[in-house]
Amino acid sequence: MWFYLVTLVGLYHLLRWYRERQVVSHLQDKYVFITGCDSGFGNLLARQLDRRGMRVLAACLTEKGAEELRNKTSDRLETVILDVTKTESIVAATQWVKERVGDRGLWGLVNNAGVLQPFAYIEWYRPEDYMPIFQVNLIGLTQVTISMLFLVKKARGRIVNVSSALGRVALFGGFYSCSKYGVEAFSDVLRHEVQDFGVKVSIIEPGSFKTEMTDAELTIERTKKVWEAAPEHIKESYGQQFFDDFCSTTKRELMKCSRNLSLVTDCMEHALTSTHPRTRYSAGWDAKFFFIPLSYLPASLVDYLLAISRGKPAQAA
């Protein structure tokens, strides 16, 4: 019995490995649009796909980021300035992409732009602190997708949305986790709706990686600003010692982030170039062996594990 079961599992993984190794033809003729290319995953992916001969359309937030990327890549790669929080910027970028791809359409749309800071407890935030997180991570992503979807449909191409392991299990992260849960839901619904048009949607779920977004000093600096602006009754409820411990723990964990960004960009590249891309990619060892397995545990057990791993607020019950 066990022999047959192990054999079946082995054959399944062998078949999956073979299918996923099949590569889309004529990659050199395919256009890929990537948001958030100033640094981090987007920047590395743009260079990676450029080296592979694909036609990369890289969206950067700043002209400085765009210029630095152009200096590191071939003449095939083109850049455009895009602020995903501004509708007029998205409309202009869509027209720019349309002029370049023509009747071929857009093979790949990679929604990579994202923000993390400030990193705090939900009660500490003001609307002006958390709204930008939603505007970039979720609203911007949906608007870019809807605006460019007709170009992707024309190419029967791919949409790759960058979520997070914290979009599968909300251990911490305040509104960052909330925004990434939204990305997961949007991507799942979108995948169902566009599959009849030959469009495939993949979700990338990175663990903890060292990028500008996870810069420890900048994160703590912005977290302190949120705390300082919080009402006095909230500060008294948690206590200064609790906040200091929270900052120390956050900084310590951010310092552990992996520097191997290719673990993420390789997943993105596979989603764009394999004839059989995965629906979800868990990128990073912490995502594969901690966050994702934790998401399958009973909520009561996860709550207990979190409760014993952190300190108590000053006015805890």
From Swiss-Prot:
Detected in liver. Residues 1-17 form the signal peptide. Its EC number is 1.1.1.105, 1.1.1.209, 1.1.1.239, 1.1.1.53. The keyword Hydrolase does not apply. It is a peripheral membrane protein. It is an enzyme of class 1 (oxidoreductase). NAD(+) binds at residues 33-57. Pfam families: adh_short. One of its GO terms (molecular function) is testosterone dehydrogenase (NAD+) activity. The keyword Cell membrane does not apply. Coiled coil: none annotated. The active site is at Y176 (proton acceptor). GO terms for cellular component: early endosome membrane; endoplasmic reticulum. Keywords: Endoplasmic reticulum, Endosome, Glycoprotein, Lipid metabolism, Membrane, Microsome, NAD, Oxidoreductase, Signal, Steroid metabolism. Optimum pH is 8.5-9.5. It catalyses: all-trans-retinol--[retinol-binding protein] + NAD(+) = all-trans-retinal--[retinol-binding protein] + NADH + H(+); all-trans-retinol + NAD(+) = all-trans-retinal + NADH + H(+); androsterone + NAD(+) = 5alpha-androstan-3,17-dione + NADH + H(+); testosterone + NAD(+) = androst-4-ene-3,17-dione + NADH + H(+). Transmembrane segments: none annotated. It comes from the Eukaryota. SUPFAM superfamilies: NAD(P)-binding Rossmann-fold domains (SSF51735). It is found in: Microsome membrane; Early endosome membrane. NAD-dependent oxidoreductase with broad substrate specificity that shows both oxidative and reductive activity (in vitro). Has 17-beta-hydroxysteroid dehydrogenase activity towards various steroids (in vitro). Converts 5-alpha-androstan-3-alpha,17-beta-diol to androsterone and estradiol to estrone (in vitro). Has 3-alpha-hydroxysteroid dehydrogenase activity towards androsterone (in vitro). Has retinol dehydrogenase activity towards all-trans-retinol (in vitro). This is 17-beta-hydroxysteroid dehydrogenase type 6.
